[in-house]
Amino acid sequence: MICFEIKKIFSKAISRISLIVLLFSLVISCYFAITNITYIDNRGVSHTGIAAARNLRKEKQRWEGVLDKAALQAVIDEYRKVNEEYPIRQGDYTANLLHDSKVQGFSEIKDMINMGLCEFRDFNYYRIDSVSKDEVGKLYENREKSLEKWLSSEETEDLFNKKEKAFLLERYHQMKTPLYYEDYDGWKSALHYAQTIVMLVMLVYAFLVSG
C-alpha cells in the first residue's frame, strides 16, 4: 500500500518538480548554514565554509569545560594578554581582525563575563578590562542579584506580576552553576535556518498531498 502511494506521488510531474525544488532548497539552506560560520586566521583573514567551521571549533574546544572561578580568571588573563599584544585600534580594520583572531576561541565566555558583571539587560564591552579577582568569583551571584534589582524596579511594574517575578527568580536560583561551556556554533547556525527548512518542507508536502 505504501509503495503504491509513493509511486502515485512520483507519477505526477508536479510532485517530481516539487521534490527537486525541495532538495535544491535544502542544499542552499545547508550551504548558508555552513558559510554563516566565520573563522579568522593568524594573518587576520576571514574564512567561511566547512574548513573554517572545523578550525573555529578547534579554537573553542581549548576552552571547553566548567566555567568556575579559575576558568573565568584564565579567560580574563588571556584577554588582557591579547589586548597588550594586539590592541584594538579605531579605524584599523586589519589590526582589529588580528585581535579578533586571538579572541574568537573564548569570545562567548568573554561576553558572558561582561554581561554577568553588569546591570541586568546591560552590556559593557570593556567591563572585562576592569574586573578584579574578587569580582570573578561573584559572577553567578551578581547575575541573580542584578535580576532581583531589575525586577524590583519601576521598569518592570507593568511587565510582570508577582507570580511571574517569583518564577523568574526561582528559575535563576535553580540554574546549576558553575556553567559548562562547549562550542555550539553548528547548532546555532542550524537553528537559525531551521525555520526556513521547515517552511519549505511543509510547502512541498502541501503540494504533494493536494496532488
Segments and roles (model prediction):
Residues 20-28, 198-204:
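Lipid-exposed faces of alpha-helical membrane segments in multi-pass integral membrane proteins
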Residues 26-103:
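Juxtamembrane non-transmembrane segments of integral membrane proteins
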Residues 121-209:
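Membrane-proximal, non-transmembrane alpha-helical segments
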Residues 63, 67-70, 74, 82-86, ...:
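Short, flexible helical or helix-coil boundary motifs
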Residues 1-22:
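Aromatic- and glycine-rich beta-strand/loop motifs that create alpha-glucan
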Residues 11-15, 36, 188-191:
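Membrane-interface helix-boundary signature
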Residues 79-141:
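Extracytoplasmic loops/domains of multi-pass membrane proteins
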